[in-house]
């Protein structure tokens, strides 16, 4: 299969390209980007000004193409429109953007894609467990106050999509509170969140705290990730899953829970 990893020279895009190459997927030498660059490590970088004129030749040379998007929140919707317009199946690893418009676009087009706020399979499994708990025990945390703090590398522009998803599950269990504190200052990340200095440029530390009204009971859920490799491997799994669905003639929108189920 041919894979176009979009978002180079970004670090996440580089890790995904390496993860896909490791599985012997054909990573083509082109990438959509917002950077004002023409080339990076042998990859030709396409931006809004030239991608429309280049894509036909790319699709002719590299048929059965799947795009993997790790660009920027501001590019999510425009890139998705580009993929749908050119009938390019895609895995959307970029968070942010207008998610309602994104989902409406791909559902109306019945476009084959995987869209998820988190590509780490283990964290997705945790998310699924909390969604199940919320559905089956909707009053489990009635009266509890929820506080959330998340730390990511300083260049992550948006609030964590995973944090938003878990907040919804806790709210569905009766907890109150929807403020997510973003920590992007490196001194605070080290002192407040205990992020190792060597992982300041790539980490995801989340803490969800629930307290009873009289503060006599405290629950805390935490997941800390150092580095980006876990997301690269999960993304490669999503690519393989999507390719399998396409080969079977199945279109539509999938998430990482579907990937986990196979």
Q: Residue ranges of each PLM-predicted region?
A:
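C-terminal substrate-binding/catalytic lobe of Rossmann-fold NAD(P)-dependent oxidoreductases
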Residues: 2-58, 142-262
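Anion (oxyanion) recognition and catalysis
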Residues: 21, 84, 107
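Short, ordered loop/turn segments at secondary-structure junctions
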Residues: 32-33, 95-97, 118-120, 151-153
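Amphipathic, non-transmembrane alpha-helical secondary structure
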Residues: 56, 60, 77, 81-85, ...
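Rossmann-like NAD(P)-binding element
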Residues: 58-78, 88-89
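Rossmann-fold NAD(P)-binding glycine/threonine-rich loop
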Residues: 74-81, 93-115, 121-132
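Rossmann-like NAD(P)H-binding beta-loop-alpha module
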Residues: 125-140, 158-159
């Amino acid at each position: 299969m041919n894979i176009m990893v979009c978002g180079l020279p970004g670090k996440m895009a580089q890790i995904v390209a390496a993860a896909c190459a490791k599985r012997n997927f054909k990573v083509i030498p082109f990438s959509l980007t917002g950077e004002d660059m023409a080339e990076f490590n042998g990859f030709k970088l396409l931006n809004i000004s030239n991608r429309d004129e280049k894509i036909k030749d790319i699709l002719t040379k590299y048929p059965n193409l799947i795009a993997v998007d790790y660009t920027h929140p501001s590019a999510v919707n425009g890139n998705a429109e580009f993929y749908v317009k050119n009938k390019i199946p895609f895995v959307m690893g970029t968070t942010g953007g207008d998610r309602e418009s994104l989902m409406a676009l791909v559902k109306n087009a019945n476009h084959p894609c995987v869209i998820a706020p988190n590509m780490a399979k283990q964290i997705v499994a945790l998310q699924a467990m909390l969604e199940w708990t919320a559905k089956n025990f909707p009053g489990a945390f009635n009266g509890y106050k929820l506080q959330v703090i998340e730390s990511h590398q300083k260049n992550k522009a948006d609030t964590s999509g995973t944090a938003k998803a878990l907040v919804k599950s806790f709210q569905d269990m009766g907890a109150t509170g929807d403020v997510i504190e973003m920590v992007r200052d490196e001194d605070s990340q080290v002192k407040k969140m205990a992020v190792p200095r060597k992982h300041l440029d790539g980490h995801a530390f989340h803490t969800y705290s629930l307290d009873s009204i009289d503060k006599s009971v405290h629950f805390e859920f935490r997941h800390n990730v150092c580095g980006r490799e876990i997301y690269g491997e999960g993304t490669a799994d999503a690519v393989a899953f999507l390719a399998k669905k396409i080969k079977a003639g199945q279109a539509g929108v999938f998430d990482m829970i579907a990937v986990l189920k196979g």
